[in-house]
């Protein structure tokens, strides 16, 4: 039974090697038809939004884990800190962080071009078939979760206001700058680095 499962995994891994990223051009459209491209786009969008929902639920998971590791009197504080990560991180990332992460700039820091929108930043960073708003939601929940990960180490060690300032800094500077290096065309991506899992 174990051997059969290992063989199936090996077959799947070999099959995925041959899947290539296809260009949606006029030749491609004439071969498969417009309906297939719409389906391709819909599946990619659903997949990105499903991934965003899973990452969003990580917020609740981290809140539960951290609450379990702390004393009962600090449970409300921990849950509020995890909620504030998303409440602070979302507007900060939409107003400034997205521009730092995906704006045209140098290899270290993107240029802020206004609030996160397709009109301000274009579509060059988008995966094939994924609309801007779905990509923005995906990146936003990752930004908030990045701030939440560290909150477990700060549980029962910081005051609430200090933690809110920390969350602001993570969402405004640390996550967008390090994200620009890899996903925004920064110096690490220019060296040929590819990050497939978001780590």
Q: Which residues does each predicted region cover?
A:
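Short, Lys/Arg-enriched N-terminal segments with co-localized hydrophobic residues
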Residues: 2-38
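Hydrophobic alpha-helical transmembrane bundles of multi-pass membrane proteins
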Residues: 29-199
């Amino acid at each position: 039974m174990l051997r059969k499962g290992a063989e199936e995994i090996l077959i799947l891994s070999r099959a995925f090697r041959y899947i290539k990223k296809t260009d949606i051009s006029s030749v491609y459209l004439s071969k498969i038809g417009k309906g297939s491209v719409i389906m391709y786009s819909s599946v990619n969008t659903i997949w990105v939004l499903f991934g965003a929902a899973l990452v969003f639920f990580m917020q609740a998971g981290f809140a539960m884990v951290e609450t379990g590791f702390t004393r009962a009197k600090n449970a409300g504080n921990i849950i509020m800190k995890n909620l504030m990560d998303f409440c602070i991180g979302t507007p900060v990332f939409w107003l400034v962080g997205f521009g730092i992460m995906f704006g045209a700039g140098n290899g270290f820091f993107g240029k802020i071009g206004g609030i996160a929108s397709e009109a301000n930043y274009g579509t060059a960073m988008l995966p094939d078939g994924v609309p801007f708003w779905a990509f923005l939601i995906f990146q936003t929940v990752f930004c908030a979760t990045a701030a939440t990960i560290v909150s477990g180490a700060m549980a029962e060690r910081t005051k609430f206001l200090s933690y809110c300032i920390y969350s602001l800094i993570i969402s405004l500077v640390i996550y967008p700058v390090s994200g620009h290096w890899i996903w925004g065309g920064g110096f690490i991506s220019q060296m040929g680095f590819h990050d497939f899992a978001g780590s």
